[in-house]
Amino acid sequence: MARIHLLHGDCKQELRNLADASVDLIVTSPPYADQRKHTYGGVPPDEYVAWFQPISAELLRILKPSGTFILNIKERVVNGERHTYVLELILAMRAQGWLWTEELVWHKKNCYPGKWPNRFRDAWERLLQFNKQKKFKMLQEEVMINTGDWAKTRLRNLSITDKVRDESRVGSGFGKKIENWVSRDKAYPTNVLHLATECSNRDHSAAFPEALPEWFIKLFTVPGDVVLDPFMGSGTTLRVARRLQRDAIGIDIHQDYIDRARAELVDPERQLALLQDRGKYVVS
């Protein structure tokens, strides 16, 4: 049975209690700049990097060498232009020792409507992937997708080029051999995730879809691994981790979120044990 640990407090302090190299995957969506003022106080864009660096330093310490850190974040428009705090944060984290391995896009299929004089509404958010080393655990087959109807037509009549490796004309070293995919019904996904926002807790300000952490948990962990969300909010990441038989740690500064997550994650029919120690809860 997966174990869920709920820690109440500021993650800057709570992360210090976790052992070195003890976490396999970190998936989180911290407060964006000037956002969640009623729940987390809001962090000004100019102060965001300085605010997050102590947190990312602790995350670097507790992540296993083979582990992955997924950071959901987005820019904020200030005085008519996008602030650069996200780009500055990436550079600062690289200076800390992180490898910025990949950037994925969360396409929000049901984003909020709106109109601005110099831009369109945001329909995407960044999913930044950081690692401690170039070789890390990654199970790509776990997130493969159905090839769909396109394969029935595209792969029906193959050209000569399709039957040999199609080397890039620009000499990039990338190429493809379409013939290899004729008998396959699965394909590797792109780095764009098309997911609608959702939130079972309407009082929580971050609409984090369950499918998002699920995708990364399947991709980067196996049952029994440890998943961490240092800004757990309503506990979406923890719910998914438990369903997928991964141990999970959730941290939040608000007691209300801790209590709600505890009430949801504890199954009275199975008489799960609850341990309370100085405001810290362990659900096993």
Each predicted region: which residue ranges?
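Core catalytic lobe of class I
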Residues: 1-260, 268, 276, 283-284
